[in-house]
From Swiss-Prot:
The lineage of its organism: Bacteria, Pseudomonadati, Campylobacterota, Epsilonproteobacteria, Campylobacterales. This is tRNA modification GTPase MnmE. The gene is mnmE. The keyword Coiled coil does not apply. HAMAP family: GTPase_MnmE (MF_00379). (6S)-5-formyl-5,6,7,8-tetrahydrofolate binds at R21, E102, K141, K466. It comes from the Bacteria. Its EC number is 3.6.-.-. It comes from Campylobacter hominis (strain ATCC BAA-381 / DSM 21671 / CCUG 45161 / LMG 19568 / NCTC 13146 / CH001A).
Length: 466
């Protein structure tokens, strides 16, 4: 990690301010080259000397750690580039644990590129994606759970997600994992006692204690894994599928919710043959709303593919909007929609009776359970019901924020369940082996056991400058 790295830490583009970030042992010296007021006098010397000589030839400027200093920036030919607020973070009290210098410059591609080019010419290297965070991890400035929380917060698209992820950033997930690991280690200690003193008299209830500890830990792992999977909508957007038979107004509802015309609306049944997906912000939540092909029996092979996609969308959705036509009598196609809903009892289902501005002919069960709307006139009630439902959900507590974390917990749970079966068979050595797998998987949430492979995979998904 001796190389000094540089990247733009803010979003690229035109804006008020851009931040160029340097990290490494030569960060301060490289900054001095840009800031030195005598650059014009040293123009000839600078143009012929190597980057390492330039670093050595300039004295370190008097940047006070954690203070903002207004400086002028010059290129290697002594030409003025920009005024910058420069902040120096002295090692080890910085994000990466190394010397960091940040240049707050005027925003825009041109200035960013000018400053970056000068720093690279003088010896810095462009940072790889996530390299600043990777250095922070390697220098023990953060653990993996915190690094993933930072990345998830950056990518989060709802206030609810940001609030939960802030808890992970604050260390709640790591503390939970440490406590869980201690419980599994405690179970391991009991097992090793049984193995080491197999010929001695042991308490009669020791196997019961092991079994109870094992069951408790399996329950904890299963709960957090299931809760985290059900809350993926907080990070990715809650999937809302609009389903119904053809020509009930599904596309009209989509267009009305989006407040622009996204789907083709026609009196001809079967107009929508492929799923249409759009993002929609409702309150503090991101919604991924999906319009689907009308579900019916069809001889058209292309339409049947669309219908299969509709059923798949319902299966994958967090919330289903089931739409029926108030102006048409209840028929076998509507009955088919009810059959699909019967298999989705674990989801929020909102039944909608559309076209209430026309003569009412639809009759099916308790119509009080339907939202009665006219998509042509107003769909605000749908937005309100969705917002009220999501606001009523309990999103408190710990959440696994990445697929890597969910996989680690899932693998740990599987290992403990295998261990449970081995305990019943009195295979204590194999039982201990499975416990070791679980311990490693749980600990990998904040400290991986396959270090290089996991770090490379994880940090490569981070943005540049982070």
């Amino acid at each position: 990690m001796s190389e000094t790295i540089v990247a733009v830490a803010t979003a690229h583009g035109i804006g008020g301010i851009s931040i160029v970030r340097l990290s490494g042992e030569n960060a301060l010296s490289l900054s001095d080259i840009l800031i030195n007021k005598n650059r014009k006098k040293n123009k000839t010397q600078n143009s012929v000397s190597s980057s390492q000589n330039r670093i050595q030839n300039f004295k370190k400027i008097n940047l006070k750690p954690r203070y903002a200093t207004l400086c002028e920036l010059y290129d290697n030919d002594g030409n003025f580039m920009d005024e910058s607020v420069v902040i120096y973070y002295k090692s080890p009290n910085s994000f990466t644990g190394e010397d960091i210098v940040e240049f707050q410059i005027h925003g825009g591609f041109t200035l960013e590129n000018l400053i970056m080019d000068e720093l690279i010419t003088n010896g810095a290297r462009i940072a790889m994606p996530g390299e600043f965070s990777k250095r922070a991890f390697l220098n023990d400035k953060m653990d993996l759970s915190k690094a993933e929380a930072i990345q998830s917060i950056i990518l989060s698209r709802s206030k609810s997600a940001a609030k939960i992820l802030a808890r992970n950033l604050h260390g709640e997930l790591k503390n939970f994992v440490i406590d869980l690991r201690k419980e599994i280690v405690k179970t391991m200690a009991f097992v090793e006692t049984c193995i080491d003193y197999a010929d001695d008299d042991l308490p009669n209830d020791i196997l019961d204690k092991i079994q109870n500890l094992l069951s408790e830990n399996i329950t904890k792992i299963d709960e957090i894994t299931q809760i985290s999977a059900s809350r993926r909508g907080l990070l990715e957007g809650f999937k809302v599928a609009i389903i119904g038979k053809p020509n009930v107004g599904k596309s009209s509802i989509l267009n009305s919710l989006l407040k622009f015309s996204r789907a083709i609306v026609s009196d001809e049944a079967g107009t929508t043959r492929d799923r249409i997906e759009e993002n929609l912000q409702i309150g503090s939540h991101l919604i991924r709303i999906i319009d689907t092909a009308g579900i019916r029996k069809s001889e058209n092979s292309v339409e049947n593919i669309g219908i299969s996609y509709s059923i798949k969308a319902a299966n994958e959705a967090d919330i289903i909007l089931a739409v029926f036509d108030a102006s048409r009598e209840f028929d076998k196609e509507d009955e088919k929609i009810f059959e699909i809903l019967q298999n989705q009892k674990d989801k929020k289902i909102i039944k909608i009776l559309n076209k209430i501005d026309l003569a009412l002919k639809f009759k099916a069960g308790n119509s009080d359970n339907f939202l009665k709307i006219s998509a042509k006139n107003d769909t605000k009630i749908i937005t309100k019901v969705l917002n009220d439902y999501l606001n009523s959900q309990n999103f408190d507590g710990i959440m696994l924020s990445s697929n890597r974390q969910i996989m680690a917990f899932s693998n740990a749970g599987k290992a403990l369940k295998r261990a449970q079966n081995l305990l019943n068979e009195n295979s204590l050595e194999l039982f201990a082996f499975e416990l070791n797998i679980a311990i490693k998987e749980i600990a990998s949430i904040y400290k991986p056991f396959e270090r290089d492979e996991i770090l490379e995979s994880m940090f490569s998904n981070f943005c540049l400058g982070k």
